[in-house]
Amino acid sequence: MTMAKLTESMTNVLEGDSMDQDVESPVAIHQPKLPKQARDDLPRHISRDRTKRKIQRYVRKDGKCNVHHGNVRETYRYLTDIFTTLVDLKWRFNLLIFVMVYTVTWLFFGMIWWLIAYIRGDMDHIEDPSWTPCVTNLNGFVSAFLFSIETETTIGYGYRVITDKCPEGIILLLIQSVLGSIVNAFMVGCMFVKISQPKKRAETLVFSTHAVISMRDGKLCLMFRVGDLRNSHIVEASIRAKLIKSKQTSEGEFIPLNQSDINVGYYTGDDRLFLVSPLIISHEINQQSPFWEISKAQLPKEELEIVVILEGIVEATGMTCQARSSYITSEILWGYRFTPVLTMEDGFYEVDYNSFHETYETSTPSLSAKELAELANRAEVPLSWSVSSKLNQHAELETEEEEKNPEELTERNGDVANLENESKV
């Protein structure tokens, strides 16, 4: 019993020491963190269970770029192009600067008018009718400030007037008139350019919320839809698309957010649009396409983004307008097509924008375009996935053979008739 108690007490002491050591020890053992690329290459069975990571957008759905510039040291470059800097500011800051510039100039010249009157002694001879002041009826800073506003805005109430006995006042009047015209031209020009910017015109250029992948003319195609809500059209409209996807070169260089072109009809002229009604933009997935080896099962695993850019000239103003949108993998529907929105009414065509974003499911192979091409080459038949079309094609081939060799067909039919007669006998 004594040995058992001694052993138990020793065990408790050791456990207590180990617990105290765990609590009081300032050293924490952390699992080494691998680089991002190495973590992505880990097998699934040893990777941690975590929720599906959301793809970070490069361009948002409304067309704004999701990029913030940090640690910009050469901020003086913004001042060298002060006009563009003011135009790019938000409206609240633009209006604040507009009011502040005019207020500061009025106060500045009002202070100078008051100093001239004070130095000349006009303030001491306000009630003296024989004294000729620089500016009549200027009896303080408030009246000098009001005279500055009247001078710069050319209001001219006639109550305060500069006299010819004040040459310094005449020079100041010329300077304020010239500087006031420059301030008016600069600030009014900024406001006019900001109001007439074609950014708001892009609000009426809409893109479908989803892109689709389906068969078109026997080829796998990526498609999305664009439309213009206004009756005044976009002149010289053109569309282009970019694939944003990180890549690693054969030399091991990692290129984040690499941009590559997606052909939407550049060589055929289909990228130049007559955007009167909604159009479906199609990208044929061929060997030059970045989607050549992507199948339906592999598409959700890809970390990519498709940026579409629609450019054109605004018919009303003649200014260039650009609208942008993007699609990530979760917004690309495999095996779907867009619902038609154009119908013919009595004497005109009507567009139903309620169905602009709607899609419907269609029969589409889940294989990649590369696998489909390999199957087609192996079978030595055109890529087609309709049984009826195959039967029709076979019937057409037989008809062509009959038209080419009618004599052989007659002899073949005669031989068949003789065999039937012999069998009857």
Swiss-Prot record:
Q: What is its main location?
A: membrane
Annotated membrane topology: Multi-pass membrane protein
- Which segments occupy the membrane without traversing it? 141-152, 153-159
Name the InterPro entries on file.
Answer: Ig_E-set (IPR014756), IRK_C (IPR041647), K_chnl_inward-rec_Kir (IPR016449), K_chnl_inward-rec_Kir3.2 (IPR003275), K_chnl_inward-rec_Kir_cyto (IPR013518), Kir_TM (IPR040445)
Q: In which tissues is it expressed?
A: Expressed in the brain.
Cellular component terms per the entry's GO annotation: inward rectifier potassium channel complex; membrane; parallel fiber to Purkinje cell synapse; postsynapse; presynapse; presynaptic membrane
Q: What ranges does the Cytoplasmic topological domain annotation cover?
A: 1-91, 191-425
Intracellular or extracellular location(s): Membrane
SUPFAM superfamilies, sorted: E set domains (SSF81296), Voltage-gated potassium channels (SSF81324)
Q: Which residues cross the membrane?
A: 92-116, 169-190
Q: Which residues lie on this side of the membrane: Extracellular?
A: 117-140, 160-168
Per the record, residues carrying Phosphoserine are S18, S25
Q: Which GO terms describe its molecular function?
A: G-protein activated inward rectifier potassium channel activity; inward rectifier potassium channel activity; potassium channel activity; voltage-gated monoatomic ion channel activity involved in regulation of presynaptic membrane potential
A GO biological-process term: negative regulation of insulin secretion
Please summarize the record's notes on activators and inhibitors of this protein. Answer: Activated by phosphatidylinositol 4,5 biphosphate (PtdIns(4,5)P2).
Location of motif PDZ-binding in this chain is: 422-425
User: Where would I look for the motif Selectivity filter in this sequence?
Assistant: 154-159
Site Role in the control of polyamine-mediated channel gating and in the blocking by intracellular magnesium — annotated at N184
Q: Which UniProt keywords apply?
A: Disease variant, Ion channel, Ion transport, Membrane, Phosphoprotein, Potassium, Potassium transport, Transmembrane, Transmembrane helix, Transport, Voltage-gated channel
User: What is the disorder linked to it?
Assistant: Defects in Kcnj6 are the cause of the weaver (wv) phenotype. Homozygous animals suffer from severe ataxia that is obvious by about the second postnatal week. The cerebellum of these animals is drastically reduced in size due to depletion of the major cell type of cerebellum, the granule cell neuron. Heterozygous animals are not ataxic but have an intermediate number of surviving granule cells. Male homozygotes are sterile, because of complete failure of sperm production. Both hetero- and homozygous animals undergo sporadic tonic-clonic seizures.
Family, per entry: Belongs to the inward rectifier-type potassium channel (TC 1.A.2.1) family. KCNJ6 subfamily.
Subunit arrangement?
Answer: Associates with KCNJ3/GIRK1to form a G-protein-activated heteromultimer pore-forming unit. Associates with KCNJ5/GRIK4 to form a G-protein-activated heteromultimer pore-forming unit. The resulting inward current is much larger. Interacts (via PDZ-binding motif) with SNX27 (via PDZ domain); the interaction is required when endocytosed to prevent degradation in lysosomes and promote recycling to the plasma membrane.
Known role = Inward rectifier potassium channels are characterized by a greater tendency to allow potassium to flow into the cell rather than out of it. Their voltage dependence is regulated by the concentration of extracellular potassium; as external potassium is raised, the voltage range of the channel opening shifts to more positive voltages. The inward rectification is mainly due to the blockage of outward current by internal magnesium. This potassium channel is controlled by G proteins. Forms a functional channel in association with KCNJ3/GIRK1.
What's the protein here called? G protein-activated inward rectifier potassium channel 2
Provide the species name: Mus musculus (Mouse)
